[in-house]
Amino acid sequence: MRIKVKVKPGTSKNEVKKIDENLYEVRTTTIPEKGKANEKVVELLSDFFDVPKSKIKIVKGQTSREKEVEVGE
């Protein structure tokens, strides 16, 4: 399944919210430095969808706050 993700780095807590059918908002306490925020986004989505981190892949938007993510099963 492919989803769109809006990332809000540097927030006070880590959370994933479903906004629409294929749109999610991910808030992370991690700052966007050297890919650390992307790693945290993958970890949070992995927990949210209950799949291993290896099944989550950022397809578009590596350096953007708006990303396209592939979630495997």
From Swiss-Prot:
Superkingdom of this protein's organism: Bacteria
Pfam families per UniProt: DUF167
Cellular component GO terms, alphabetical: cytoplasm
InterPro entries attached to this UniProt entry: DUF167, YggU-like_sf
NCBIfam families: DUF167 family protein
Family matches, as PANTHER family: UPF0235 PROTEIN C15ORF40
Family named by the database record: Belongs to the UPF0235 family.
Name of the protein: UPF0235 protein SYO3AOP1_0257
UniProt organism field: Sulfurihydrogenibium sp. (strain YO3AOP1)
